Design a protein with these regions (language model features):
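N-terminal export signals
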Residues: 2, 8-26
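A short beta-strand motif characteristic of beta-propeller blades
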Residues: 34-38, 78-81, 120-125, 162-167, ...
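Beta-rich, blade/repeat-based domains predominating
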Residues: 41-53, 84-95, 127-140, 171-182, ...
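Conserved beta-strand positions in repeat-built beta-propeller and related beta-rich domains
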Residues: 59-63, 101-105, 144-150, 187-191, ...
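Short loop/turn segments that connect beta-strands within beta-propeller blades
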Residues: 71-75, 113-117, 157-161, 199-203, ...
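Blade-level signature of beta-propeller repeat domains, shared across WD40, Kelch, NHL, RCC1
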Residues: 303-329
Length: 329
C-alpha cells in the first residue's frame, strides 16, 4: 500500500482538526429541492432510484415487490409487479432503455423493458444459497454484474442469459457496485470493510484495503477519471481511491458522528453523499475540499441511495415515502 501523506492520514483517521478545516456552505436555496409524496395506497418500501429514459424515475419498492415509476411532470406513481415473493433492492438504467433490478426475494436479476413493461427474471443458478441480492451495474461489454450481501458477486451475460456466481473474499458484506469509464467493475463490502475490482474474465475479486480499519464501505461510485468514491458507514468518511496511483484520501463531513450511507458522482465530478445523523445531503467539491449542505423539510428521510441525470440529483426517502430531486442547473 502506498504511504499516505500527513494530510491524507489525518483525513483517513477522521481527525477533528481536519474536519474543522472543511466548513459547510449555506443551506440549499429555495426552489432547488423539490419533493413529492409517492401517494400509493400502502407503503412501498422505496429503496433505490434510477433515471428512466423518458424523463421519469424508477424506484425499487422493496416492501411491496414492485418496480415503481414516478412521473415528475404529473406527480403520479405507477407500480409494476415483479413476481411472487419479490423484494427488490437495486435498480439501474441499461443501454437497452430497460430497468435492471436486483431482487433478493426472487433470488434473481430482473429486467423490465421500457416502455413495454415486460418483466423477465434471470434466476441465480439452482442450488445457490440465499444471496441477499443488493446492487448491480453494467460493464463495458454490456453485461450485468451484481453483489449479494450474503457473500457473493455475479454476472448476467446479457446475450446468452447465463448467470454465474462467485464467492466474495472474507464472506458476507458485498454491497455497492459501480463501473468506471473504462468499463472496469468495482464493488465494496460493508461487513468486510474493503473495495475490490472484479476480474471480468475469471469473476475473481482483487481486494484493495483502505487505510481506515473497519470503515464499513457501503456504496461506491466512479468519477470521470476512474477514481472510486466510497461512502463509509462506520467511519462516516467520504473516501476516494485512485487505482492509477494506489493512493487513498478521505474527508469527514461536518458533525460529531456522521453516518455516511450513499455516494453518487454527478456529471461535473462532484460527489454527493447522504448523511443520516444530520438528516441531510452534502455535495463535496474536491478542489476546495468543502462540503455544501442540503437540508430536508422532513425528519428521518433515510436516503439509502442516490442517482441522477444531468442537472438533477434524485433521492428516495425510505423513511417518509417521498421522492426528491435537487436541481443543480
Amino acid at each position: 500500500m502506498n504511504t499516505l501523506s500527513r494530510r491524507e492520514m489525518l483525513a483517513a483517521l477522521g481527525a477533528g482538526a481536519l474536519a474543522a478545516t472543511l466548513p459547510m456552505r449555506a443551506f440549499a436555496q429555495p426552489g432547488r429541492m423539490q419533493s413529492w409524496p409517492l401517494g400509493t395506497s400502502s407503503r412501498t418500501g422505496i429503496h433505490d432510484v434510477a433515471p428512466a429514459p423518458d424523463g421519469g424515475v424508477w424506484f425499487t419498492a422493496q416492501r411491496s415487490g414492485h418496480l415503481g415509476y414516478f412521473d415528475p411532470r404529473s406527480g403520479k406513481t405507477e407500480l409494476i409487479p415483479l413476481g411472487k415473493g419479490s423484494s427488490p433492492h437495486g435498480v439501474i438504467p441499461g443501454p437497452d432503455n430497460a430497468a435492471w433490478i436486483t431482487d433478493g426475494g426472487q433470488q434473481a436479476i430482473v429486467r423490465v423493458s421500457w416502455p413495454q413493461r415486460e418483466v423477465r427474471p434471470y434466476a441465480l443458478p439452482k442450488g445457490t444459497p440465499y444471496a441477499n441480492l443488493n446492487t448491480c451495474t453494467l460493464d463495458g461489454d454490456g453485461d450485468v454484474w451484481f453483489t449479494g450481501q450474503s457473500g457473493v458477486t455475479g454476472r448476467v451475460e446479457v446475450k446468452s442469459g447465463k448467470v454465474s456466481v462467485n464467492d466474495a473474499p472474507r464472506g458476507r458484506g458485498p454491497y455497492g457496485i459501480c463501473t468506471t469509464p473504462a468499463g472496469d467493475v468495482w464493488y465494496c463490502s460493508l461487513a468486510g470493510s474493503f473495495i475490490a475490482r472484479i476480474d471480468r474474465k475469471s469473476g475473481e475479486s482483487i481486494v484493495v484495503a483502505p487505510p481506515t480499519p473497519d470503515q464499513g464501505a457501503r456504496r461506491v461510485w466512479s468519477d470521470s477519471r476512474g477514481r472510486i468514491w466510497v461512502s463509509e458507514w462506520n467511519s462516516g468518511n467520504l473516501s476516494m481511491h485512485d487505482p492509477k496511483t494506489g493512493k487513498w484520501s478521505a474527508w469527514k463531513p461536518p458533525g460529531t458522528a456522521p453516518r455516511t450511507y450513499a455516494v453518487y458522482v454527478d456529471e461535473s465530478d462532484h460527489p454527493w453523499i447522504s448523511e443520516w445523523a444530520a438528516n441531510a445531503m452534502y455535495r463535496f467539491d474536491p478542489g476546495s475540499e468543502k462540503f455544501e449542505r442540503f437540508d430536508f423539510p422532513r425528519e428521518q428521510v433515510a436516503i439509502r441511495q442516490i442517482h441522477g441525470r444531468r442537472g438533477e440529483i434524485w433521492l428516495p426517502e425510505s423513511g417518509t415515502e417521498h421522492i426528491t430531486v435537487i436541481r443543480t442547473a
